[in-house]
Amino acid sequence: MGKTIAIAVLSAVVGAGLTLALTRSPSGSTSSRPARTADGKPNFSGIWQAINEAHWDLQAHEARSGIVTQPGVYPSYEFARVPAAPVLALGAAAGVPGSIGVVEGDGQIPYKPEAAAMKKENGEHWIDRDPELKCYLPGIPRAMYMPYPFQIVQSANKIQMAYTFANAARTIHLDKVEGPPDDTYMGHSVGRWEGDTLIVDVTSFNGKNWLDRAGNFHSAALKLVERYTPITPDAIRYEVTIEDPEVFTRPWTISMPLYRRLEPNAQLIEYPCIEFAEEFLYGHVRKQPLVRRWEGETMIVDITRKVPPGDKFYDWYRR
């Protein structure tokens, strides 16, 4: 209790990365793309992206730090808390940009008292609790407003959505389909058209997702009603009503525009984040864990990538 953590880094090696193009969109020219499909429905096929701060916090908020703290040199005083070592190391990258919010009505999320306490605790510990950091599938609606593009491929009876983060995907069934045998991260989506609005009921969640990085969450009882309404050929109004009687006192709604990516070479680039989270998830099972030991108030961390003696590939690579 009351330790001020310093991290002693012994050495580090940074490896090279490789990204692969998954899909390429048609030309960004609006004139070359029909506004409607052959069956007369709005044409949502293409690459889209939300441009807002909902990924960090659905509610209105000022810009702030990563707000993960630990006791300082005066552990009995809350005002003397200091940034936790992992957040401090990230600098401004751990900050949260300000936002006017996307929650409709009074802007409040109607938590039950015990759920509100859990949300607060989540927010204070997002650096090791947020499912995004573990590269878990982001779930719906979070996948819709992460700061990465996603692709819609539309047909008469199915709508496919592919997301950049974690190679997530889902199918919106416009035809009759049986429910899934198990609950999942991305849920089960069944859609219908009401005029030009696509309405999607999403159920069968496993309750392991968050709604944003601020710690807003839901349970496996979550039910969503999404509405996709065209504003222009290149913008969609996205609304989702969120209902979860185990967490919230009433249904509530968020809304935002989604924008079509118009670059001629717009495409999804693979983001295989699981390989970036392996140490975070499984580092404790290393034969020699990176968190080596405590020396008083100093945590000794070794992030050296050990090379076995006589490794021929490494010797060849270093030539």
Task: Show the residue positions of the predicted features.
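PEST-like low-complexity, intrinsically disordered acidic/proline/serine-rich tracts
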Residues: 2-319
